UniProtKB/Swiss-Prot annotation:
Classification via InterPro entries: Helicase_ATP-bd (IPR014001), Helicase_C-like (IPR001650), P-loop_NTPase (IPR027417), SNF2-like_sf (IPR038718), SNF2/RAD54-like_C (IPR049730), SNF2_N (IPR000330), SNF2_RAD54_helicase_repair (IPR050496)
Molecular function, one GO term: DNA binding
Protein name: DNA excision repair protein ERCC-6-like
GO BP terms in the entry: cell division
Keywords (A to Z) from UniProt: ATP-binding, Cell cycle, Cell division, Centromere, Chromosome, DNA-binding, Helicase, Hydrolase, Kinetochore, Mitosis, Nucleotide-binding, Phosphoprotein, Repeat, TPR repeat
Quaternary structure (record): Interacts with PLK1, which phosphorylates it. Both proteins are mutually dependent on each other for correct subcellular localization. Interacts (via N-terminal TPR repeat) with BEND3 (via BEN domains 1 and 3); the interaction is direct.
Gene3D superfamilies named among the record's database cross-references: P-loop containing nucleotide triphosphate hydrolases, Tandem AAA-ATPase domain
Pfam family, one: Helicase_C
UniProt binding sites for ATP: D123, D124, M125, G126, L127, G128, K129, T130
CDD domains associated with the record: DEXHc_ERCC6L (cd18001), SF2_C_SNF (cd18793)
Keyword Cell division: yes
Sites bearing Phosphoserine, chain numbering: S14, S755, S773, S821, S966, S998, S1001, S1021, S1092, S1112, S1172
Native organism taxonomy: Eukaryota, Metazoa, Chordata, Craniata, Vertebrata
Tissue/organ expression: Expressed mainly in the neural tube and heart of 10.5 dpc embryo. Significantly down-regulated after alcohol exposure in embryonic brain and heart, but not in embryonic kidney, liver, or lung.
Amino acid sequence: MEASQGLAEVETLSPQLAESYLRYVQEAKEAAKNGDLEESLKLFNLAKDIFPTKKVMSRIQKLQEALEQLAEEEDDDEFIDVCSSGLLLYRELYEKLFEHQKEGIAFLYSLYKDGRKGGILADDMGLGKTVQIIAFLSGMFDASLVNHVLLIMPTNLINTWVNEFAKWTPGMRVKTFHGSSKSERTRSLTRIQQRNGVVITTYQMLLNNWQQLASFNGQAFVWDYVILDEAHKIKSASTKSAVCARAIPASNRLLLTGTPVQNNLQELWSLFDFACQGSLLGTLKTFKMEYEHPIIRAREKDATPGEKALGLKISENLMEIIKPYFLRRTKEEVQTKKADNPEARLGEKNPAGEAICDMFSLARKNDLIVWIRLLPLQEEIYRKFVSLDHIKELLMETRSPLAELGVLKKLCDHPRLLSARACRLLNLGTATFSAQDENEQEDVSNMNSIDHLPDKTLIQESGKMIFLMSLLERLQDEGHQTLVFSQSIKILNIIERLLKNKHFKTLRIDGTVTHLWEREKRIQLFQQNKEYSVFLLTTQVGGVGLTLTAATRVVIFDPSWNPATDAQAVDRVYRIGQKENVVVYRLITCGTVEEKIYRRQVFKDSLIRQTTGEKKNPFRYFTKQELKELFTVGDLQKSATQMQLQCLHAAQRRSDEKLDEHIAYLHLLGIAGISDHDLMFTRDLSVKEELDMLEDSQYIHQRVQKAQFLVESESQNTVQRQTTGIEETWLKAQEFPSQQKKKGTEFNKPQPQPSRLLTKPTQVEAISSQMASITICDQSAESEPQEHSEVHDVTSLQGSHHFNSTSDAGTIASLPQGAESIGEVSTDSLLSPAKGFAAENDAMQKKGLQASPGQEAPSENLGSFHYLPRESSKASLGPNLDLQDSVVLYHRSPTANENQNLESDVPMIEISDDLSEPPSALQGAQAIEAQLELKEDDPLKSPPQYACDFNLFLEDSADTRQNLSSKFLEHVEKEKSLQSPAANSRAKSALTLSLDSSPKSDEESEVISVKTKSKTRRILSDDEDEDEEDAFKGSHTNSINISPFPFSSVKQFDASTPQSGSNPSRRFFSPKTPGEVNTSLHSRRSLASRRSLINVVLDDVEDMEERLDNSSEEESEPGLSEENNEEEALACTEEQPSGATLASGNKSSNLTMSEPTSPAPQSSPCAPEPSSSDPMPDPPQDLAVEAGNDYESLVARGKELKECGKIQEALNCLVKALDIKSADPEVMLMTLSLYKQLNI
């Protein structure tokens, strides 16, 4: 109404005056946006002289206040050089950082300054990686070195990052690309891309919107930095998260993770391959052969002296390679450094100005392994299950080793975890048997079968449950708050029921709690209310992103295969802010599969410590055979592992009188013993034996030289392809529905066989250009694990490629077990349907292939390797590949059944004697083996294995299995979507992927289009109340939500926004350089300085007012809302290693955007926005009225306090009011005025 009345009044002016008025207003706005506030004020005064409207008068008043504020702030913000790195950081921010955090910022800047494309910040959990990144970005933005940053993280960490940005850098423009409102997401992203700032999004949003994040106005958009938090999400290069992350163009990439290695070194390779864009560690095939295999073998207790020496030297070489790109500090390391330099951190304070707990004085942590005996009932079922086949048939749903392990783990925890049918057959109580159980539907509803059982029965059926109930009662009496972690929701159900019946006050977070606001509410309740003595959490959900320092005791009910998973759970308590001693109880049953799982945890931990530089030569606890024995039943009354650790570390325990009394009490509970997990690897091994071996063997030195040369060569090849544009990271084409459907109907047409393609730039023909001419002579047909293989040099001609290499006839090279040849091509990321391999295998067998994919090649023996690089040996790599690593590709064969048929085109290696085969046959064998590599960690799809060997496939391969199955389902869904009748009703944007590997393959390949959501073009107003000039011009721009205060409502997902303009960072936010003129308007303001808030508000004052008009027009997308719920539920899924669980794919992880199912109600302009990806349910009417009353009362109270001269109290009231309703310009300006008075 106000806008229409203003227009009516303007129309009463003469055309000349109206034109002048609108011109002055428009020019004044442009001047304000460009930072020229004096010119803007002058133009608004000219407009006022023509027609003095209320809006013009209001803007003149705001500009005058802003100019007065700037005039008072004549001094520049003060900056300090961080650790003499050259990066200037705002002094107030710098003084709040710990010393190790300053060193981390200097490391991040050194990556940029030295021209490295990326790196990994792998500090231990709880050392403040978030703060380091925020402070680093503050310095980079202040220096105008970056403009656009994309930050990707798990969903449950969004609020944490938004709060930290608002606290540490209130002047930084931070927007969230998340939530159910597509228009709001798009507007936030566009604002950052047009100006500068940080976009925060989630991995699930990345999966569904990677095209939008990678483009701007139809062109590829290159981010200055792409930063991944919890980067172990991409530990497998073939997962969809990793593929989509690679599709985002970026100048620099940073990874944050407290667990860079969780299971094997391939995960470390995957992280560096992404961070450094393939320019550091070569291809996965060569890395595994030259680095991973020797290092893993050297960590086993029964390794030979030569293997230990080789592993030590290879590990040192790997550390030298990654050192410039990798920084990791543990809590122990930082505390030790502080003890050596006590003056390093005097007078540190937190952002609120209060003294905080010095992290270097973190209290003691005792990590105890409590060895539990199985009860007679559990022991009887356990032994029978392992030894009798008919018992397995009763208890198992699918016959696979992994499913057997799942059943054994359930038996160790509680027999009631088995299905109701199995409980009835085992005569466990009088559990009911329903038809649902006959269909093997095991879900939470099965818990109803134990509702009628008494608590005493539930406790007495599990040795762990007996110990846990006694422990929790004792801890409650002592006044401790305890976290209880389990991988099973059913276990948490049992524990929760037992504790409630014992009148415990408990809280719980698991995968069923999908709303972030609900999780935060429970966390805050536990942190602030000591009456809640127990917090129940699933390991996967509660182990990441939570701070629960109110607890001092942690119970891990069941061990995970992944040592990092349990370590993350412990670090929810033992982190910065913890002031009390922490005790951890890991419950493990004696002689069972859990003890074997713990052994593998220790082995993986030794691998992690060595490869990340924590320990040069960690202690070796177990032999290879001991690690393999998963299904053997040991002594179930005592633990061999416990006795071994007792002998090694019994005298090293750090304790006090209270802890000694507590441990004595634990022994009274009938446990088998206690070990100290925190003392593992405290005994360093002498490297004398390895050093003696190094002096005697030139082979080891030459082997290390060879490994380094190969990865460097492959990395250089990758960089060359990237610089020549052969493998671009972003490709997009749009087609109309008719074109899509036309292409879709051609899927069944016979096509010439396409050549094999690679989907990652780093997984190319790894060493074909260097080693393709080597002939390997077999010395013995059947050999032990360490056989000899001799290498002679020959000249091999393959098509148009000519390879030549010369060396002495006596040189020796070694191949690891299971490798067909040195020249095998890594195709770990080759994505194909599972059934395609079987058909392809049959087809190749019909052609007469005799080579077995799993055939072992001659293995290693100590000798010498003389490597002479020659220019003639460097040949070009086959046809150019114009495909990026970020695209999921599928081939369609010309056969009737449409099975996949791939052919390798890499240069061949001639193998003499019995290993020789025709080139075509060997190519086929390599193609088969390449596909087998996709499943090498999958016991469910691999050929039957002996039970004792099965553990070799247990390296957390669920991601790979789910990835393969989900990609096949995704391919089917895409075909259906292309043929859908709805495709003809509206325009869709699609990504067309060309599967050609050469210019000639345009007609030989097929096109798969990825369906995206239809987009309705809308024009949104950027000005307030549909200004008069908008009515004349009819032009509108995007709207935006503003929250300019560091203490503003987190529900808005907005931190304060810096000044916009052609180069806003140069105008207000850059450190002052020598020789610059210091004026009141052009003084430098840091994003970390709260004084920058004044400029923020002035810059976007129109946007703040516009929210009142445009917020009512926002529409949310129910489809995406459901998608966000599904995302969080997926992120919270418990770890259940059963056959049925592992067989299920990640149904929500796809590259297509889901269609909205129904129109969403319009949101109120005054309603608070949801604080998570899941929209909050509509509040009741009375709650809305109460919130309105609270707002009015807070504003009134703030005005009264202001009149009384109580500035701080008034400011607090107004800030709380803004948290309820942040779009009131009057209250915001009043708040700014109070803040200004406090700063004077």
